[in-house]
Design a protein with these regions (language model features):
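Surface-exposed intrinsically disordered loops and tails
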Residues: 217-243
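Membrane-proximal, proline-rich intrinsically disordered regions
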Residues: 4, 20-71
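Bacterial Sec-type N-terminal signal peptides, specifically the leucine/valine-rich hydrophobic h-region
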Residues: 14-17
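Bacterial N-terminal signal peptides that target proteins for export
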Residues: 1-7
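Aromatic-residue-lined binding/catalytic grooves and analogous aromatic/hydrophobic interfacial grooves
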Residues: 21, 204, 251, 256-257
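Conserved, well-structured interaction surfaces
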Residues: 45, 86-163, 184-194, 204, ...
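Short, flexible, mixed-charge acidic loops at enzyme active sites
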Residues: 165-179, 222-225
């Protein structure tokens, strides 16, 4: 597993859980119940796409885990580049008790674990579904499960980097939980080494699941940057299987390992 020298944030956060009324059996016009969503194979495609959309939010890779908080903590920016943001100013000085940076950290934590919960829901539903429910059979089912497991691993890994100590520090305190089932309201906190072991386990399983698609069936979609990113080459099975460069693919999983 690659090593990252990242600031350790000793912050205890609570996940907030929301409940809905059992008697309300009417779906909002812009939402679909999980039962309806997973009735067909296409619903699994939509659910996976929804996970990618959630990960692109400003709380995660749309800002904080890319050019936002993560870059501030790595001291990428000069002081005068971030003085207008009190949250980032506090982060740069590792002053995590300030209200503004607390709000940012809480949003990363809650949004990250929400993504993980959605990955777990998708995995459990797909594993319980016969491969005949998917247009491309076992190939598609395995690809969806593989991507979801790899995304779950990556999300845990980035939460670990922010909220737990480095292995090299020798600190074996247990800081974050690792969720693999849905629903699950509680999992015990684990040490950094324990989390990394689970991340590696998920990634190894994911690599095996996506391998046939990315290295045998649709190798052309991985052949060049144009094919991976631009979709200039038609993928076997349709558009869902194209543009692998913007999805969790075999090469990306190996890079994480």
């Amino acid at each position: 597993m690659k090593k990252y020298n990242f600031a350790i944030i000793g912050v205890t956060l609570l996940l907030s859980l929301s409940a809905c009324n059992d008697w309300l059996d009417i779906d909002p016009s812009d939402q679909v119940s999980s039962e309806k969503l997973f009735e067909s194979g296409d619903g699994f495609r939509n659910a996976l796409n929804g996970i990618y959309i959630a990960m692109s939010s400003s709380e995660l890779y749309g800002r904080e885990l890319s050019w936002g908080l993560a870059s501030v903590l790595s001291q990428t920016y000069a002081d005068n580049d971030i003085t207008k943001s009190k949250a980032y100013g506090s982060a740069m000085e590792y002053e995590y008790g300030e209200t503004e940076i607390k709000a940012v950290l809480e949003s990363v934590w809650s949004k990250g674990y929400n993504v993980i919960a959605n990955c777990n829901k998708l995995i459990s539903e797909a594993e319980a579904k016969d491969s005949t429910a998917f247009r491309e059979g076992a190939l598609e089912r395995n690809l969806i499960i593989g991507e979801a497991k790899a995304l779950r691993a990556m999300m845990h890994f980035d939460i670990l980097r922010l909220f737990a100590p480095s292995v090299e520090s020798g600190d074996e305190s247990k800081r974050i939980p690792y969720f693999t089932v849905y629903p699950s309201k509680y999992e015990p906190n684990l040490s950094t080494k324990e989390i990394l072991n689970k991340v590696e386990e998920d990634l190894l399983e994911a690599r095996q699941l996506v391998a046939k698609h990315d290295t045998i069936v649709n190798t052309s979609t991985m052949a060049s940057p144009d094919y991976r990113m631009g979709g200039t080459n038609k993928a076997t099975g349709g558009d869902f299987f194209g543009q692998r460069g913007i999805r969790m693919n075999y090469v990306a999983i190996n890079a994480l390992l």
